[in-house]
Amino acid sequence: MTSRTDETANATALGYEQARDELIEVVRRLEAGGTTLEESLALWERGEELAKVCRTWLEGARKRLDAALAEEENAGDDSE
């Protein structure tokens, strides 16, 4: 059995697509029902970790896009 810290570390090592796909599977399992309360709580906790990973990836992508757009605007201003 893995510790909670190990699971969190594993989640943060995932790429966006991997985390998103696993999150989709977690949601599917929760919506399907048929799990014990303990299993449901574990799935919910994993889902929260995965959602955080996805959010971090998306925020990083947004920052990179904003930086690239700002750089492009600055380059355009310098050429005038």
UniProtKB/Swiss-Prot annotation:
Reaction equations catalysed: Exonucleolytic cleavage in either 5'- to 3'- or 3'- to 5'-direction to yield nucleoside 5'-phosphates
Record carries keyword Metal-binding: no
Tagged with keyword Cytoplasm: yes
GO molecular function ontology, one term from the record: exodeoxyribonuclease VII activity
EC assignment: 3.1.11.6
Gene Ontology BP, a term: DNA catabolic process
Main EC class the enzyme belongs to: hydrolase
UniProtKB keywords: Cytoplasm, Exonuclease, Hydrolase, Nuclease
SUPFAM superfamilies, per the entry: XseB-like (SSF116842)
GO cellular component, one term: exodeoxyribonuclease VII complex
Subcellular localization: Cytoplasm
Function description: Bidirectionally degrades single-stranded DNA into large acid-insoluble oligonucleotides, which are then degraded further into small acid-soluble oligonucleotides.
Family per record: Belongs to the XseB family.
Quaternary data: Heterooligomer composed of large and small subunits.
Protein name listed in UniProt: Exodeoxyribonuclease 7 small subunit
Lineage of origin: Bacteria, Bacillati, Actinomycetota, Actinomycetes, Kitasatosporales
